[in-house]
Amino acid sequence: MTQLAIGKPAPLGAHYDGQGVNFTLFSAHAERVELCVFDANGQEHRYDLPGHSGDIWHGYLPDARPGLRYGYRVHGPWQPAEGHRFNPAKLLIDPCARQIDGEFKDNPLLHAGHNEPDYRDNAAIAPKCVVVVDHYDWEDDAPPRTPWGSTIIYEAHVKGLTYLHPEIPVEIRGTYKALGHPVMINYLKQLGITALELLPVAQFASEPRLQRMGLSNYWGYNPVAMFALHPAYACSPETALDEFRDAIKALHKAGIEVILDIVLNHSAELDLDGPLFSLRGIDNRSYYWIREDGDYHNWTGCGNTLNLSHPAVVDYASACLRYWVETCHVDGFRFDLAAVMGRTPEFRQDAPLFTAIQNCPVLSQVKLIAEPWDIAPGGYQVGNFPPLFAEWNDHFRDAARRFWLHYDLPLGAFAGRFAASSDVFKRNGRLPSAAINLVTAHDGFTLRDCVCFNHKHNEANGEENRDGTNNNYSNNHGKEGLGGSLDLVERRRDSIHALLTTLLLSQGTPMLLAGDEHGHSQYGNNNAYCQDNQLTWLDWSQASSGLTAFTAALIHLRKRIPALVENRWWEEGDGNVRWLNRYAQPLSTDEWQNGPKQLQILLSDRFLIAINATLEVTEIVLPAGEWHAIPPFAGEDNPVITAVWQGPAHGLCVFQR
């Protein structure tokens, strides 16, 4: 039987050098680590890792080749009160594995035990890691490096974006390949998108609770192997990595960046009753935030929280991010529940992971976007991230909806959000692009549902409609649900136009939810994380071509307005912005706080956004000059206006002089 050589303690994971494979695994509290390899017949062969450098266990297996399936058994104390849950009866996934063979099914054997260990061996049904070799021809690929001021983000789900697209070949719909298909790329280019932000593509598992209900985790925020691509989005699991890189290369050639939504806050092992896949059995005490009683701090709402202040976990997270940039050429990351990244346990801008990213010559050069909160006390950190990060701006989302759908927001508050929420983000040398403005996202109502539903309708999720937020700031315009009279449809359309215009012509970085430009509806489900079906898949055959054209025209208009693309804070008298009332005069203090919802925003001294958010048709006196409406607001008859615009109720128009 081949013996393991000591090998090297770096890099982490399994790496083939042409002669064999070097294996490394971090565990500060293990007493012994067994490498378990499986032959073509499924026969298991075990080897003790002979090397032990600090907290890194390592060994080298001569003559091992790519395609080898492996896992680990980690020996150590079973002391739940101390946070130790070692159980060598359970085969464990390498946290740095780049391919997984097998499925993460709901099975009692995939649990370590709660108070007492479960010593039933699970190797027969446990997923296995696969050794891969990395050879890929990137040709002349180069990152687009779109300036932040010119960035337009499109948030999409790999499967949902293309699964029903009639012009994409059936055999690749819903896959990584489809992202790089010319039809998809041409669509994104015509729309004006510069960055495709993908919901999680790292391998994830469906929670046992969902599996028992016949549902699955659709969004992917339940990670199990952070270096491995989710195989369900590949035409073949063996070629997933190349399919993904082919898509990125094609998108880059079209000038489109790729941003990955990544989950570094918790794992699919969930709470103490959850499954055992990897980290819990490798070094529970190091990888997770542990309470004094040995249970987890649940700052994520998912049962556990990764301890990103532990040096080894920081190294693991940093290596993961570098892998996606260096191996897959991704252009940035959106970090789910990113406040966890800064916990020490209190949130700090100089937290270890933030510092590591800041000091990394690779990671400090890509786009970094934070979802700036978690669910624990002190978890709401909007505006408090380090300067390298942009942040989801929920202030903007709520203000836009309140102004146009609830009519209860003063002009001053609306203007503050329109101006990149400078009261929140203008600090520490940050630029307006730090505000990622959004009206909708994967989490919540779609744009169409914002104007068709007053209440969430999440019954299909199996939680009796208890899940999902109740604070939607939506307005069904008088009838719950889709459809209705022509007047109702037109009023809803006008509200959608107003919200899109506010999003795409505001200062900051706009993020558009895929499908909002189509009129996609989830029929009132505002938490469709477990709906892998026609509720979430974009139905291209039913897309509103008029709304798509309207959205594209707004995006292309945005790119013509210097005040929006120069990425500089607006200052009084700098010519970037003037705020005027319905009479083209500067607003008084009282008008800012108590005036009617009528406003004119003059950008770059040439582009005028005239707003009438009242219930009545109102005359708006335009500033001096000859004005004409511009696409998408220009009609066939587009006369020059020199004096007054008849502003329809809840309406707006954009002019140029």
From Swiss-Prot:
It catalyses: Hydrolysis of (1->6)-alpha-D-glucosidic linkages to branches with degrees of polymerization of three or four glucose residues in limit dextrin. Belongs to the glycosyl hydrolase 13 family. Pfam families: Alpha-amylase, CBM_48, GlgX_C. The active site is at D336 (nucleophile), E371 (proton donor). CDD domains: AmyAc_Glg_debranch, E_set_GDE_Isoamylase_N. This is Glycogen debranching enzyme. Residues 458-467 have a biased composition (Basic and acidic residues). It comes from the Bacteria. HAMAP family: GlgX. PANTHER family: GLYCOGEN DEBRANCHING ENZYME. One of its GO terms (molecular function) is glycogen debranching enzyme activity. Its EC number is 3.2.1.196. GO terms for biological process: glycogen catabolic process. Residues 458-479 are annotated as: Disordered. SMART domains: Aamy. The record marks D443 as: Transition state stabilizer. The lineage of its organism: Bacteria, Pseudomonadati, Pseudomonadota, Gammaproteobacteria, Enterobacterales. Removes maltotriose and maltotetraose chains that are attached by 1,6-alpha-linkage to the limit dextrin main chain, generating a debranched limit dextrin.
